[in-house]
Every structure is written in C-alpha cells, then in structure tokens.
Amino acid sequence: MYFIDFPLEIVTSIQEVDIDTLRCHEEVVENRLSSFIDYLKTLDGDIIMSSIIVCDETMIIVDGHHRYHALKHFGLNKIPVTFIKYNSPEIKAFYDDRISKSEIVDIVNSGKLLSPKSSKHVIFDKKLNAYLPILLLSSMWHFNLKKYK
C-alpha cells in the first residue's frame, strides 16, 4: 500500500454527484476514450474504478476526463467524486508550471476547453519532497456496468 504525505484538509469530501454538474477543462483523446469504453464493455459487470477528482468550488474536473466521458456514455447519472481544495499551494496544474490553475479556471469560465492532456495535475508529497500524480488522492469505487450496457 502506498501512502502519500499531504495536508489532509485538501480532500474536502467524497460524494456521489450528478454527472451533469461536473465541468470539463480539456478535450479527450477520442481513440483512447473509445478504447476505454470498449474495454469496459468486455468486463463482466463488476468494475472498480478511481473516482473523478473535482474542485470543490468550481465543479471543474481536475483528473478523470476519460473516466467521466466513459461513464456518461454508459448513462450513469450519479458518480463518485473526490472533492479537493484546488487552490491549495500543494497542487499544481503541471510539473513544470506550463499552465496555471487560474488559467484553467479562466478557460473553463470562458466556455472553452484545452487540448487533450494539456494539464497533468500533481500534488506535493512532503515525505518524498516531490510532486506526484493527483490521481493518488482518488478514492476507489465499485459499480456494476450490467445495469447500463
């Protein structure tokens, strides 16, 4: 088991939310999305997946655009979300600061989307003194896809 050392108050809650309340900030790689959907169709119903990571103030998806679009494809109305304090200084939109979190929020608020994989959100691990993928904050959840196929 891996433990990431970060301020626990960054994760504000884990909730099941209406999928239509979430806001994307970037496009997806279409062939990657279709491959993911095809893969999910091959599973025998039961799936364990990482929750979508979302800003608790803006409802912007921080991590999980392909998962979000796949779940929407299957008609799920409510999905588990790990809400975070996106404005935390421990979170960056990319390892090398090529894009800022405020730029992402501004782009979403303008009604536009970034190109696929324009961001790669990371969180600072105090123990390792390094930035790690923000996916590590995600919670795992179980659902049965047979209800949606």
Describe the residue ranges of each PLM region.
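Short, charged/polar connector segments at secondary-structure boundaries
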Residues: 1-57, 68-149
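Short, glycine-rich nucleotide/cofactor-binding loops
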Residues: 60-61
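Short, conserved phosphate/pyrophosphate- and ester-handling motifs at nucleotide-, phospho-/glycolipid
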Residues: 64
